[in-house]
Design a protein with these regions (language model features):
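Short, solvent-exposed loop/turn segments at the edges of secondary structure
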Residues: 38, 51, 71, 113, ...
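Flexible glycine/proline-enriched surface loops and loop-helix/loop-strand junctions
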Residues: 163-166, 185-192
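Short beta-strand segments
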Residues: 57-59, 120, 149-151, 183-185
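A short core secondary-structure module
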Residues: 132-137, 191-199
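Short, histidine-centered active-site or binding-site loop motifs used for metal coordination
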Residues: 1-4, 184-188
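Acidic/His- and Gly-rich active-site-bordering loop/insert found
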Residues: 2-86, 107-112
Length: 199
């Protein structure tokens, strides 16, 4: 249970999750430099160059589990080809994905072309101070990141809020410019009263 609540950083809750990460990803913990900041994690993977370092980030905490659940909210059950539980989509899936990718690359002896940082806050769900503490640590080290990849996006295949079929969520935040081409086909209508099937 890694739920977080407004204005309360319950670091002890996350220590168990950190142990699971150590067991599942031994090479990450052996080969990368780990810094723990009040339950928040920062890993440093030395690359061939320190120019243009990148940061992969996501959060460990989840919102409280309320209501009825098909599977226990903290079970991580695998059923019907899916992982069920809090954090399966928001967003321990990202944490596990980047740890798994790095673990496999380390096993192959891969050295990234530039320095890579992995960061995971434990207070994101209530806008806490986890990410700012990680930023402060990076600033203390004099790190100027070239690219930050945070949670979000992806192709959603499950119905959400009455939307059926596959759809992609695109989120961009940068200084500069991004060109996105988007095509939707539908009968005309007005945004205030969209007809059924409007993309």
């Amino acid at each position: 249970d890694t739920t977080s609540h407004a204005n309360v950083a319950e670091v002890e809750k996350f220590l168990g999750f950190h142990k699971v990460l150590e067991e599942l990803f031994p090479l990450v913990h052996e080969k990368l430099e780990k810094t723990e900041i009040d339950g928040n994690l920062l890993f440093y993977w030395k690359g061939k160059s320190s120019e243009k370092p990148i940061l992969l980030m996501s959060h460990q905490d989840v919102v409280p589990a309320e209501g009825e659940w098909i599977h226990a909210p903290f079970s991580g059950d695998i059923a019907e080809g899916k992982v069920w539980g809090r954090g399966a989509s928001d967003t321990k899936c990202s944490v596990m994905a980047f740890f798994q990718a790095v673990e496999e690359l380390l096993a192959e002896g891969f050295v990234p072309p530039t320095d890579v940082y992995l960061a995971s806050s434990c207070t994101e769900e209530w806008g806490g101070d986890g990410a700012p503490k990680i930023v402060a640590e990076l600033q203390r080290r004099g790190i100027e990141l070239f690219l930050v990849c945070d949670e979000g996006g992806g192709i959603i295949t499950e119905p959400i809020g009455g939307i059926h079929g596959n759809f992609a969520m695109v989120g961009v935040f940068e200084k500069g410019k991004a060109d996105v081409k988007f095509t939707a086909r539908s009968n005309g209508g007005h945004a205030s009263t969209p007809v059924k099937g409007t993309p």
